[in-house]
Amino acid sequence: MKSIIMAAGKGTRMKSDLPKVVHLAHGKPMIVRIIDALNTLDVEENILILGHKREKVLEVLGNDVSYVVQEEQLGTGHAVKQAIPKIKDYDGDVLIINGDIPLIRKQTLIDFYNLYKNENADGIILSAIFENPFSYGRVIKDGNKVLRIVEEKEANEEQKKVKEINAGVYIFKAQALVKALEKINNNNEKGEYYITDVIEILSNDKKVISYSLEDSMEIQGVNSKVELALVSKVLRERKNTALMEDGVILIDPATTYIDDEVKIGRDTTIYPNVTLQGNTEIGENSEILSGTRIIDSKIYDNVRIESSVIEESIVENGVTIGPYAHLRPKSHLKENVHIGNFVETKKSTLEKGVKAGHLTYLGDAHIGEKTNIGAGTITCNYDGKNKFKTEIGKDVFIGSDTMLVAPVNIGDNSLIGAGSVITKDVPSDSLSVERSKQIIKEGWKK
């Protein structure tokens, strides 16, 4: 099967410089969500109908995607016609879908396709029952057979009473679709070519059926930032519900933002106002407290993180972090490390049991087991041109307000006096102090 994804619309009501389909619905571009859903059907080629600022869509999807261009906006039928060169010699099925319905479920598309195949139909439309169907195309049927779809502006009073509406998703046999597209015209109030006219053309001598959705929210389109927020909320609720059903504790799901790819182990508690993004994994029995943001990181079991930011890092069992710590990319905290308030790490490994309680920067560093980093310690890793590494051994005590000017090595079991500026390697089992002599001048202030 091939698909045709309608993604050429300007999205005027979005009031944005971006094409509508690249806006993020719960952290992922809408067009990516549509393609992800279609991949469930083992689609051999997704053909995108692009128009307004198509280069922005290609930036998201890559230039190797299959697409055609609709230069003029002359209706949905005109859009699909642009894809005829890509399907005219194809003998399979073609699925047509709007690019702005990110709530469509994978299982819905599977059931939709299976009904089409089981009924040996020539075409099928996805429909839904709306109590207030205003503005939607109405599905006109004779028993189970679909006769036509009538747009709101073209419908008579009797047709407007029909509550079954067109959801904008179709499957047709490719050759039947191509022949029908050649017959559609723009003799209607809007002067546009409607893809829905294909239904009436095919129904004259072929079998066209419908599949009615149980959850009409799946076809919620996005035409404004308000509707974008609505679908994002639904997607967030789906993710949070699935996590809770798997044993995760969400104190307040309404204020918890967790991307689709995030994995969380059972009995982990997520507090309000937490954001978990990208390919983040969190183990079991951990606590992620309010104000925390974790991106593309792996968090093990029994970890406690409070009001901190963690990016592209690894946090092993029993670690405590925060409040107000920042783990920048390539930080690796091993078992039972403690990182306190206003501590920043970057491209550093802290071995088992290391403690850095407060006001510290550890960049391009390796710190051995059970070392204590005093308040105000800074690894001076950058000379204005290059980055250098600081190596600190195990069981080291770094006094407060110490500057470690890289490259520098501190040996095991060493002690660095508070206020020191260390520029030379310190051997193991040593005391190193580097600071000016304290001078006292009595009676200085008269």
Curated annotation (Swiss-Prot):
EC identifiers of the protein: 2.7.7.23, 2.3.1.157
Pfam assignment, any one: NTP_transferase
Subunit and interaction comment: Homotrimer.
Pathway(s) annotated for this protein in UniProt: Nucleotide-sugar biosynthesis; UDP-N-acetyl-alpha-D-glucosamine biosynthesis; N-acetyl-alpha-D-glucosamine 1-phosphate from alpha-D-glucosamine 6-phosphate (route II): step 2/2; Nucleotide-sugar biosynthesis; UDP-N-acetyl-alpha-D-glucosamine biosynthesis; UDP-N-acetyl-alpha-D-glucosamine from N-acetyl-alpha-D-glucosamine 1-phosphate: step 1/1; Bacterial outer membrane biogenesis; LPS lipid A biosynthesis
Record region (N-acetyltransferase): 247-446
The protein, known as: Bifunctional protein GlmU
Family per record: In the N-terminal section; belongs to the N-acetylglucosamine-1-phosphate uridyltransferase family. In the C-terminal section; belongs to the transferase hexapeptide repeat family.
Keywords: Acyltransferase, Cell shape, Cell wall biogenesis/degradation, Cytoplasm, Magnesium, Metal-binding, Multifunctional enzyme, Nucleotidyltransferase, Peptidoglycan synthesis, Repeat, Transferase
Gene field: glmU
GO terms (BP aspect): cell morphogenesis; cell wall organization; lipid A biosynthetic process; peptidoglycan biosynthetic process; regulation of cell shape; UDP-N-acetylglucosamine biosynthetic process
The organism of origin for this protein: Fusobacterium nucleatum subsp. nucleatum (strain ATCC 25586 / DSM 15643 / BCRC 10681 / CIP 101130 / JCM 8532 / KCTC 2640 / LMG 13131 / VPI 4355)
Region (Linker): 226-246
Origin superkingdom: Bacteria
Protein location: Cytoplasm
Cofactor note as given: Binds 1 Mg(2+) ion per subunit.
Active site: H358 (proton acceptor)
Lineage: Bacteria, Fusobacteriati, Fusobacteriota, Fusobacteriia, Fusobacteriales
Reaction(s) catalysed (UniProt annotation): alpha-D-glucosamine 1-phosphate + acetyl-CoA = N-acetyl-alpha-D-glucosamine 1-phosphate + CoA + H(+); N-acetyl-alpha-D-glucosamine 1-phosphate + UTP + H(+) = UDP-N-acetyl-alpha-D-glucosamine + diphosphate
Disulfide bonds listed in the record: none
